[in-house]
């Protein structure tokens, strides 16, 4: 697989470029797919996992790697952590707004105060976000919800290691997670408990 960088994308700031590459390329989507195909290939045991789409798993992993990439960037670590938290808060807010729109029937005027709190005040911007959320329900939930599920799996894996007096490492968890996916989080949690 290859990752194409459009010339216009290279003009973006280094943080956005670095985190986008982490999300889309290495260690995000591209790495996850290459890992699956190179370690398991497609066989009778996993053909359904190969054919089916598990957006919470794949977007959860990609967002996890994106947010993790902030800690590997050069520069002021406090500032990088602030940027990471800002990204996470934005995604969380978009999930909340998505739920408010599709569950509670929230309107543009209902969501504008939430967006204003994070600096989005221009009516055209608020309308664009509202329109996107209306037309693409659940989009941000697969990212942020998948990420939160991944963090639950990570904590479950860590506790399992501790209960069995095994040394926990992020590397071991990452390998376990990638070897057991793509799949539902229910199945991954069951695999952790049965490992």
Positions of predicted regions on the chain:
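Long, His/Glu/Asp-enriched segments that create or flank divalent metal/ion-associated functional microenvironments
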Residues: 1-195
